[in-house]
């Protein structure tokens, strides 16, 4: 009788101990060192890291949720990475410096906190879930062979950075809200088209080396909107954008001929310069307030901001052509007190277009000028150190004598 009572208790205790043991192993960080790892956890509470020695094809099956990070860096012999079970990664999904990786398939993945794909020279496309990844906080895709990003189906993101992907000539996104920064730079050999037809609000937007950028539903930019070094961009329109909080910039866009902001009423700093073919600046019919300064420089033949009634900063306008009529507009605004800072307007200025007006390609890397400055700084440091060393040596010799 007692045995019959004790036996179930012993079995139950054994099951509890085994479950506790399994739970402990699923709470630890896991390092993968072979191509078909056994991970008997539905939920991994730590990180999963792939060892640099793994080569060929790697399948990670078993876990459905990773509450830590999935890190695959410097695994230079890896050709294929896949999982049919992982549906969410609560930390970073990081793939960097995988020189041979050509296949990436996570057929159940729907959610990831931070996605980093960088320096993947052979990776041409992504396969994420049946509907793609639908939730992410930050995404960075840099220096890859990717030509298709249809696996990303995000509605809201904090930060999205896409740069230096030479084969990426089209990015069509369903994003509605960007709470921090959108950076699209140096993709598609200057011929990239970006379609963000659902985007309504954004904080910071930085665009370089694109040929087309479409945001028909955009209504508000809570930081800045910047177009710099877009040699193939010929026009831009924001038909529903009413407010830009910090700054609006068009700089060094060689083929730019038209910009249109038909309902924009308020902006921060306004800068339009070094756009050699932009001869008519008439795209601000409702702009009344500029909370900052104005810098306009180019080959303008016509400049109109008819409703402008307040500029809280200074105004500096210059053109290689005769814009005396528009200069009178700013002179009168200054005399009325509508311009609170300094005001200067110059016609027929041969230096109105700067040296960078070729609209040349930009990139995410530093410029040669920066390198030269760094070299000069380094030389200065060496010179100072040598001088200090010389003084120290002389002082030492004096003491010896």
Q: Residue ranges of each PLM-predicted region?
A:
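Concave beta-strand-loop units of leucine-rich repeat
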Residues: 22-37, 45-59, 66-101, 105-147, ...
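Cleavable C-terminal sorting propeptides in eukaryotic secreted/cell-surface proteins
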Residues: 376-401
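C-terminal low-complexity, Ser/Thr- and acidic/Pro-rich disordered "stalk" regions positioned immediately N-terminal
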Residues: 329-376
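Classical eukaryotic N-terminal signal peptides for Sec-dependent ER targeting/secretion
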Residues: 1-10, 384-386, 401
